[in-house]
Amino acid sequence: MLVGIMSDSHDNLPLVKRAVEFFNAEGCALVIHAGDIISPFSIAVLNKLACPFRAVYGNNDGEKVGLKLKAAALGGSIDNPPIMVEADGITIRVLHDCGDWRAEARSSGADVVVFGHTHQVVVEYDGEDRKILGINPGETGGWLSGVSSVALLDTAS
């Protein structure tokens, strides 16, 4: 199962649209957004996804009721972090601001921790058998770095 991961889109609609097109082209079965969508009009772009989406609020998501209503109307969901998502037998803990993703994984029992907030890409393994994974997809919006980024998680590998 392929899971698309994005974060910190910050209302940059052209780059959110590009991410949606990428996730659809890759055949993602689920998309996770790790916060800072910002406005309800921005979440509407996720309507073009060919799969369900799950999201958490970020520190800049002020209009929470509007975001929640819009996500629900599109068949997705957005909730206060952290949330746990099950994908093909893999447990994924999703939050926005994560001080120590390894501690989050250990305390929650998650296989994967997805987070955002820093706008910096992180893909790191932890544990003796390297079976615990931390993923920060960077920033989909590209406002701080000038680079738009997302991540893919293949649950089979």
For the regions a protein language model found, what residue spans apply to each?
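Acidic, histidine-bearing metal-coordination/catalytic regions of metal-dependent phosphoesterases
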Residues: M1-L2, F53, L152-S157
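Active-site environment of divalent metal-dependent phosphoester hydrolases
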Residues: H10-L15, I38-F41, N60-G66, G99-E104, ...
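Short acidic, glycine/proline-enriched helix-loop-strand junctions
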Residues: I43-R54, E128-G134
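Helix-adjacent hinge/juxtasegments
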Residues: A50-C98
